[in-house]
Amino acid sequence: MATFADLPDSVLLEIFSYLPVRDRIRISRVCHHWKKLVDDRWLWRHVDLTLYTMRPKVMWHLLRRYMASRLHSLRMGGYLFSGSQAPQLSPALMRALGQKCPNLKRLCLHVANLSMVPITSLPCTLRTLELHSCEISMAWLHKEQDPTVLPLLECIVLDRVPAFRDEHLQGLTRFRALRSLVLGGTYRVTETGLDMGLQELNYLQRLEVLGCTLSADSTLLAISRHLRDVRKIRLTVRGLSAPGLSVLEGMPALESLCLLGPLVTPEMPSPQEILASCLTMPKLRVLELQGLGWEGQEAERILSKGLPHCMVIVRALPKESMDWWM
């Protein structure tokens, strides 16, 4: 019977990659060969530190000993709900990430207090920045700040960031490389603020507006006015009507449209009305309807038959992927 000793290094590395960071370091003590494998650059491309209460001293050790130039994606948590005496993410740590991890492209911060961490301290190599349940200051994304900050940033995800408001949205215009914006539960953003923000972010190619207080109709109206080159739209159907959906008709570059439930709006367009609007979108290749309760129903048959050039996906809301770096 085969044992671990019989497995090739490539298989062992694949197995080790599924281990939490703490266990990964522990197995390096098993033998010299495993220690060498744990030091492999491939194993430290994507690191998830949200599973632990990570003290700054430990974080600094990991940064110096294991991550450095190997790191491509980092997911880490803060101590937002742990009291005033809990250690917080610091500007010094963010600057060290930028200096010691020149290949870091994606940074995901969870439950972190960033009020005292200026955006200027974040690694300038970032292409994707995700904030999940984080606290930011009013000045964090102020429009008048240094326009050279994060020059490569292409995607920003703002998920349940309660302080995020219209002024922050307008401050995103400094990121000239930005192509993808995700707003999740950002309840302080108003319809007027979204319209003004998108007017200056007219180079966006992907926009997601999920679980916000904005109606789907007002969101689509702002998109149709300002984002003529948008390729992917994903939004919650709250407040969606057939006239609201019709403003997307003729969108020249739209390739993917995703509408998410739950179905709570009485004005929700019928499958026939959705079909009529989609037929006017020349480049539409993906239509996705999630959580509307239409899976296996007549609606799915109507849309699939009427859009033979499209991939029509009708399904329940999926569970969140554990592959956070994808």
UniProtKB/Swiss-Prot annotation:
The answer on whether this UniProt entry bears the keyword Repeat reads: yes
User: F-box domain location, by residue?
Assistant: 1-47
Q: Which residues form a coiled coil?
A: none
Keyword Repeat belongs to the record = yes
Q: Name one Pfam family in it.
A: F-box-like
Entry-linked PROSITE patterns: FBOX
Could you name the domain of life of the organism this protein comes from? Eukaryota
> SUPFAM superfamilies in the record, alphabetically?
F-box domain, RNI-like
Q: Biological process GO terms, please?
A: protein ubiquitination
SMART domains associated with the record: FBOX (SM00256)
The entry's function note states: Substrate-recognition component of the SCF (SKP1-CUL1-F-box protein)-type E3 ubiquitin ligase complex. Mediates the polyubiquitination and proteasomal degradation of CAMK1 leading to disruption of cyclin D1/CDK4 complex assembly which results in G1 cell cycle arrest in lung epithelia.
Protein's UniProt name: F-box/LRR-repeat protein 12
Kindly list the organism's lineage: Eukaryota, Metazoa, Chordata, Craniata, Vertebrata
